[in-house]
């Protein structure tokens, strides 16, 4: 006789009530650090033409552009190392401590880029020092986005995780807007000659005060409820084992959660390739290939990004209602179908059509960024969440980070301005496969954590849904048992000796 496993019901005491004040602080601190990360990426992408002339003088303009963007891409090689390092520490000692460390390293390394003398002053050491600073950034960023997304996800109520998580990439886009705006403002005030001489350094100097503010906010945060629950469980069951912190098993990650790892890699590749193509490569594409002035190209991208800021939280809010998968599928299909039309518009040399083409790509990007920060942390349980997510995220970013360099090389080598569109179509297929195979995570507790609600009333509603789900599961199991027993009866009738 098949036996049914008893399901232990939860009570109101098992539901975590999230404090609104702590949630707002967590979102602000996480988003600010993420904004600073993308502020640097935005600045670097928008001043790539200047950096090419400062650190790679004497080379052909095309070579200068590719070399500057290659320096942008090389640090992605070290990001997986940073991800593994900070991920392991984050699962062992907590999320808050690691986020404080990453923002310090990131702000100092960004600030130091502004201090590097030009190639004319110190020769080959100029690009070498630039590369060292970028690699330090890459190491810290390896634990930044994953840690920030986990921090927000573990602080968010289950029914609002999509909306709350969307503010993390709101910070990313805002960082790009700030970086681009600073570049345009400074270059306009000081003129192109002075900007190439010393003005390009100012945006990098701004990173230090931003880092100090971010450190202050993150230092004041408490550990997330989900991680604290995990520590409490370990403390109750294994006080001796807790002395060295919770254990992280990479064997468990690779063998038990390989499907989640692949899903994470696919989603991040689809999102970040589109991200880097639109927000990092397009300014250079507009200026170098379409012969727009640098400021003109940047202003177009700034306008697009400001529009994205308004769409971003709407996507997160809608994902709490309709789920995360529909947005991944919609974004992937739209990217595949509209990549070529978008670049036909961009290459039209008509300002209105260029804007329309970029806007198409921006809305598609919002489909991905609106759900990514809430989707990724839900794929793994608390005790391995940081390590697993950091490993998968940074491996995929290693691929996505090559986008500006690869796109520039493809265009230069083929003399075909449609190559970026073909590249995006390939990435769209990756996103589509990911969307089809991924599991829905909206409105569900994080793995390894109790349900989380924003107030008592919502907690009671969660309990009602929980009991309804249990009753449905019990009915489903009863039907399965009945079907199995019927199959057993038929087999016994066909082979009577089996039941002897």
Curated annotation (Swiss-Prot):
One of its GO terms (cellular component) is plasma membrane. Its main location: membrane. It comes from the Bacteria. Residues 453-498 form a coiled coil. Residues 1-37, 87-97, 143-169, 216-260, 319-325, 372-390, 438-500 are cytoplasmic. It is found in: Cell inner membrane. Induction: Induced by an increase in the osmolarity of the growth medium. Residues 59-65, 119-121, 191-194, 282-297, 347-350, 412-416 are periplasmic. GO terms for biological process: amino acid transport; cellular hyperosmotic response; cellular hyperosmotic salinity response; glycine betaine transport; osmosensory signaling pathway; proline import across plasma membrane. The keyword Isomerase does not apply. InterPro entries: H+-coupled_symporters, MFS_dom, MFS_sugar_transport-like, MFS_trans_sf, MHS_symport, Osmo_CC, ProP_C, Sugar_transporter_CS. GO terms for molecular function: proline:proton symporter activity; protein homodimerization activity. The chain crosses the membrane at residues 38-58, 66-86, 98-118, 122-142, 170-190, 195-215, 261-281, 298-318, 326-346, 351-371, 391-411, 417-437. It is a multi-pass membrane protein. Keywords: Cell inner membrane, Cell membrane, Coiled coil, Membrane, Symport, Transmembrane, Transmembrane helix, Transport. Belongs to the major facilitator superfamily. Metabolite:H+ Symporter (MHS) family (TC 2.A.1.6) family. Proton symporter that senses osmotic shifts and responds by importing osmolytes such as proline, glycine betaine, stachydrine, pipecolic acid, ectoine and taurine. It is both an osmosensor and an osmoregulator which is available to participate early in the bacterial osmoregulatory response. This is Proline/betaine transporter. The lineage of its organism: Bacteria, Pseudomonadati, Pseudomonadota, Gammaproteobacteria, Enterobacterales.
